Design a protein with these regions (language model features):
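Glycine-centered flexibility motif
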Residues: 85-86, 273-275, 290, 470, ...
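Active-site-proximal substrate-binding groove within the catalytic cores of carbohydrate-active enzymes
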Residues: 111, 115-116, 121-178, 185, ...
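Carbohydrate-recognition beta-sandwich/jelly-roll modules
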Residues: 21-264, 270, 308, 589, ...
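Aromatic-lined carbohydrate-binding/catalytic grooves of carbohydrate-active enzymes
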Residues: 211-363, 375-376, 384-389, 395
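Positively charged n-region of N-terminal signal peptides that target proteins for export
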Residues: 1-5
Length: 602
């Protein structure tokens, strides 16, 4: 009976979809004109419909192309929600307002409305669209806005716009179904492999699943200057030592003595000039932190204690103070000017073209770093924390899609050389070649710090986690890092600033619970012995649930106000209770601000 009902619902949903299988394409021109037209969607399958906007329609006077699903209208008071790539969602409960995100960790957005549930898969220009929610007089419009003007700053439009709308029905007609759908898409096309599948090829990954990451932040670093400066050897700021290699040996011993059996140490600031100091050059080893012999002893000591230790590397940033400095490998605009972004320890930061570095020095440098003794997930900063850069240099021109391919080639080589690879955040253009990330995104922290800026946002669901749990190891958000240290005393985002390691000491049980609910694992950035006990506390919190790191997350739902049920592929279930009262599940009480694990293997 259940199967017949599900089949009926699928047929009914598809019929409804067929009756309205159009999308509105709205062209916004540079002079402010707008032209909208209804476009019939192409049948890819019974439940997948494709929108194509030919590149011939992306002429020089086009600024934006908006893509709106006609078949899922929503207004205030409707049951359901819109959902963004990270899992940020909003209920249909506002009269007016707007929300937008210019960057998406996965090229997906979705809606659940009274008439339809779907997830949209952006197949082209995934690095060039904004996610938008606009509400006027209680009517919601949720759409992708393709920034054609920005594409043209670098290249003439080189692809059609292609968006696939995936219809959901029955038990799949929710954000869990959206996540499972995109995960299936990624697995079936070979873009990613599960952890269980990869372990046979990368045994270091098996250890990593049971370990938390402690990132020594940093051994040494120059202070971040106040002004954007092209430093020289004569004008650069001095390196400040935070945890020299000899002291780091004592630090890892203290962690072992605290009773921690498995850790993956990420050594940041070991390199030439300290953290972000003189990249793209990493060698020789930072003399101020102790030099190569001391680093080798630190690595050897760490490994003898039974811990992993890997190196932090920065391949996207370069500075004029580096002995390797050359404008030849820097990404360039069409007019030949250098692509720069940000201000870090090395001064004004320029973006390295990954095509140029791959065909230049990077592959050899990976081997040279491995020769120091590092083994485990080689950490390459930034790759998964933002979009790939672009380059119009005629000698190594690359679209962001091509740049992503070179990032993946470098990560794949790192996996072969070190036994694994890692990066910073959850942007999934490199998902097939990373084992862990430091955090998925920073939206939870943003919403908590400034809720007044996001009136349309109701919260965050683990959409990304349903896609990638059991594929990539992660911590959910900047908000949930270093959580047993308390909240950061300073309102800053730059982890290269030592003040980022200062906590207020006030722990919040809701943060610990959020890590469990979202299937994450703790991570610590530190150079202080005062954090040893805090790291041990975080590790103890992780122990009861760490075996689930190898499992796929199958669903997440709110089963009562403030109570969430998470199901895993092996049959395990976790109930997380944020409410003020105990919640009864399976005839057992789940106490307030706690969780209970129901082990699927028992």
């Amino acid at each position: 009976m259940v199967k017949k009902l599900s089949a009926f619902l699928l047929i009914a949903a598809c019929c409804c979809f067929s009756m309205g299988e159009t999308a509105t394409v709205r062209t916004i021109f540079k002079d402010g004109r707008k032209i909208s037209k209804s476009v019939k969607l192409e049948d890819v399958s019974e439940s997948v419909k494709r929108l194509t906007v030919p590149k011939s329609e992306l002429s020089g006077d086009v600024r934006f192309i908006d893509v709106v699903a006609d078949f899922a209208p929503a207004k205030k008071g409707d049951d359901g929600y819109w959902i963004h790539a990270r899992g940020t969602y909003g209920k249909f409960d506002k009269d007016s307002g707007s929300y937008g995100m210019s960057r998406q960790v996965i090229p997906v957005w979705g809606m659940k409305t009274p008439s339809a549930a779907f997830w949209a898969n952006v197949r082209t220009y995934r690095f060039d669209y904004q996610f938008r929610v606009e509400v006027k007089n209680g009517n919601y419009e949720v759409f992708a806005r393709f920034d054609i003007e920005n594409v043209r700053k670098w290249f003439e439009p080189y692809n059609d716009i292609v968006v696939d709308f995936n219809l959901l029905s029955g038990e799949d007609a929710n954000y869990s179904g959206m996540g499972r759908g995109y995960r299936k898409f990624q697995l079936e096309r070979g873009a990613v492999r599960t952890i269980k599948d990869r372990i046979k090829d990368f045994p270091e990954l098996d250890y990593l699943c049971d370990a938390i990451v402690v990132r020594i932040q940093t051994h040494a670093a120059k202070p971040i200057p106040e002004k954007s400066i092209d430093f020289t050897k004569e004008t650069e700021l001095p390196v400040v030592v935070h945890m020299p290699f000899g002291v780091a040996e004592e630090f890892v011993k203290a962690l072992k003595d605290a009773g921690i059996d498995k850790l993956s140490i990420c050594s940041a600031g070991w390199n030439f000039g300290g953290y972000d100091g003189r990249t793209p050059q990493h060698l020789p080893v930072c003399a101020e932190a102790g030099g190569e012999d001391a680093l080798r002893r630190f690595i050897e000591t760490t490994q003898k204690l039974g811990f992993q230790i890997s190196a932090h590397a920065t391949l996207t940033d370069c500075y004029t103070v580096s002995p390797m400095w050359s404008p030849d490998y820097v990404g360039k605009y069409p007019d030949g000017s250098l692509d720069s972004n940000g201000l870090w320890s090395g001064g004004k930061c320029y973006r390295v073209c990954q095509k140029a570095s791959y065909n230049g020095w990077v592959l050899k440098e990976l081997e040279d770093i491995r020769a120091l003794g590092f083994k485990g997930p080689h950490y390459i900063d930034v790759y998964s924390a933002t979009y790939p850069n672009r380059c119009s240099d005629k000698n190594h021109s690359a679209t962001p899609e091509e740049m992503a391919e070179y990032q993946n080639r470098i990560l794949a080589r790192a996996k072969k050389v070190f036994g694994g690879a890692a990066s910073e955040a959850g942007f999934d253009h490199v998902a097939g070649n990373i084992d862990y990330i430091n955090y998925v995104d920073r939206v939870m922290k943003q919403y908590e710090d400034h809720p007044e800026k996001y009136p349309l946002v109701s919260g965050v669901y683990p959409l990304w986690e349903i896609v990638y749990h059991g594929i990539i190891l992660y911590n959910p958000d900047r908000l949930t890092q270093n959580h047993t240290r308390g909240r950061c005393l300073y309102k800053l985002e730059k982890s290269g600033d030592p003040r980022w390691m200062e906590g207020d000491g006030i722990t919040d049980p809701k943060i610990s619970l959020k890590i469990v609910e979202f299937g994450g694992r703790p991570i610590f950035y530190t150079y202080k012995f005062a954090d040893v006990g805090r790291i041990k506390k975080a590790y103890d919190e992780f122990l009861p649930v760490r075996r689930l790191q190898r499992e796929l997350m199958e669903s997440h739902e709110e089963i009562s106000e403030g109570v969430f049920l998470v199901k895993y592929g092996d049959g395990s279930e976790i109930v997380c209770n944020y409410s003020k009262m105990p919640f009864k599940y399976r005839n057992e009480n789940v106490e307030s601000l706690s969780y209970k694990l129901y082990d699927g293997k028992k």
